Amino acid sequence: LEHDKNVICEKPFVQSTTQAKELKKLADEKGLIIVEAITNLYLENFKQIQKELNKIAPIHIVNLNYTQYSSRYDAFLEGKIAPVFDPKKDGGALMDLNIYNIHLVSALFGLPDQVQYYANMQKGVDTSGILHLSYPDKQASLTASKDSYVTPRSFIEGEKGSIYFDGSTGTLDNFTVEMRNEQPKRYNLNKYPHRMAAEFNTFAQMIDQHDTQKADEAFVNTLETMQILTKAKNSMI
């Protein structure tokens, strides 16, 4: 930014809400684009999930799970600390994996009233944990794990039905809508085989057209996510 370059910043955007605001302020002052690279919010499946929410509403329970046994976990147990497990570099399950869950919940439901993170700690870092978000009308449980193995499944549960999907919340390869007393319907609307294609096509268009409005809209979600992350880290148990 200081060298007048537009910036695509890998998730998590920064370490704190304060840093996020500082970078956005600098970008705005220089008339530049700054945007967070977060795959799931730009996928066609996510956009369709947004449209399907009203069908199952009112929504009371959200369970999102991103479990991925880390390829560096065995080395971590032997004392070889990679950056993704280094607390000094904001490693750990919350910042590396639960960030995807937080982005989804923030984009779908906004900021919660209460935030509490329950972490499994090893060598000073959270290798897994559950983030609980409390809303006036719903409860959300966001699980992320780098030390366990499972095929994760996530649910959004409402009075009229549910939306659920298997696998990573970062890729959203497909999802199913199941209404009460109806047959479930499975969807996959993603256009590209690579999970990053949709977001980078959006970023290219955003930068080519200097679409600051779209960048501002993306930053709203980034800032909300950083606010939740900051509270989660401060609440860590």
Locations of the language-model features?
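Active-site loop of classical SDR/Rossmann-like NAD(P)-dependent oxidoreductases
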Residues: 188-201, 217
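Contiguous beta-strand/loop segments that form the cofactor/metal-binding neighborhood of enzyme cores
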Residues: 101-171, 200-209
